[in-house]
């Protein structure tokens, strides 16, 4: 594979870079994690060339630092992503993601009869793996859902 020696997306002075997001997932992450509501600059690369994945998405959040729990919640949709903290254009911390045990306050339960729908609030989910697939169990209605059908609030 050829080496790519030119930045496809402009570097940031400080903040967070989320790299190795599967292609076509970057916009979903922006929406799910409500980063579109920040007043800080967001730079994205979609369908960028990648040696590991053929194509990838990339998100750069200027002046935004994710804590470990926030970063690990990304692994539901981007398990191979890395989260890099940047300071003065230099990576000061690189985090490989781990699947969290619980996801709080981000996603909405797909069950129309769930009490979280009546209260118009985000549900809390317990993360489970069955047959190498990720499922989310709603803490309110106790139903399991494939992670791909659980949506933002």
Swiss-Prot record:
InterPro entries: Asp_carbamoyltransf_reg_N (IPR020545), Asp_carbamoylTrfase_reg (IPR002801), Asp_carbamoyltrfase_reg_C (IPR020542), Asp_carbatrfase_reg_C_sf (IPR036792), Asp_carbatrfase_reg_N_sf (IPR036793). Zn(2+) binds at residues 109, 114, 138, 141. Its cofactor is Zn(2+). GO terms for biological process: 'de novo' pyrimidine nucleobase biosynthetic process; pyrimidine nucleotide biosynthetic process. Keywords: Metal-binding, Pyrimidine biosynthesis, Zinc. GO terms for cellular component: aspartate carbamoyltransferase complex. Disulfide bonds: none annotated. Contains catalytic and regulatory chains. Belongs to the PyrI family. NCBIfam families: ATCase_reg. This is Aspartate carbamoyltransferase regulatory chain. It comes from Wigglesworthia glossinidia brevipalpis.
């Amino acid at each position: 594979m050829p080496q790519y020696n030119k930045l496809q997306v402009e570097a940031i002075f400080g903040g967070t870079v989320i790299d190795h997001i599967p292609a076509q997932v970057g916009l979903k992450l922006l929406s799910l994690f409500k980063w579109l509501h920040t007043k800080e600059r967001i730079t994205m690369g979609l369908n960028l060339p990648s040696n590991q994945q053929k194509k990838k998405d990339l998100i750069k959040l200027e002046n935004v630092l994710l804590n470990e729990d926030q970063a690990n919640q990304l692994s539901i949709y981007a398990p191979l992503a890395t989260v890099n903290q940047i300071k003065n254009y230099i990576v000061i911390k690189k985090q490989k993601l781990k699947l969290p045990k619980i996801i709080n306050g981000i996603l909405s339960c797909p069950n129309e009869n769930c009490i979280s729908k009546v209260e118009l609030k985000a549900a809390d989910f317990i993360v489970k793996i069955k047959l190498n697939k990720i499922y989310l169990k709603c803490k309110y209605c106790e139903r399991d859902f494939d992670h791909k059908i659980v949506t933002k609030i």
